[in-house]
């Protein structure tokens, strides 16, 4: 298990089970370090509209296995914990309140 300090200074757990789940997606193969990097220094962080305890960390990568895409790392922040749920590549950011960068 890895513990990553996010851009807000919070400790986020990335378990071996979650990283195995994420890397099962062929388009994310070889992007384990990018997942950590997005948490530490994202382009943008938004609150999920479907679950206020979930935040979406985004960074754009011009070269992925499927072309230029946003890498989204999904983190759940229940009381006294924080862990990566999943990560995926996407063409656009989901709507939601922007937490980072601070306006």
Give a label for each model feature.
Residues 1-103:
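Ribonuclease/tRNase effector modules and their secretory precursors
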């Amino acid at each position: 298990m890895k513990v990553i300090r996010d851009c807000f200074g919070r400790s986020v757990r990335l378990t071996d089970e979650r990283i195995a789940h994420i890397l099962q997606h062929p388009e994310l193969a070889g992007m384990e370090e990018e997942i950590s990097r997005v948490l530490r220094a994202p382009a943008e962080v938004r609150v999920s509209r479907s679950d206020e305890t979930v935040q979406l960390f985004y960074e754009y990568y011009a070269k992925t296995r499927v072309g230029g895409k946003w890498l989204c790392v999904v983190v759940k922040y229940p009381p006294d914990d924080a862990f990566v749920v999943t990560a995926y590549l996407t063409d656009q950011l989901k709507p939601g309140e922007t937490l980072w960068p601070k306006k």
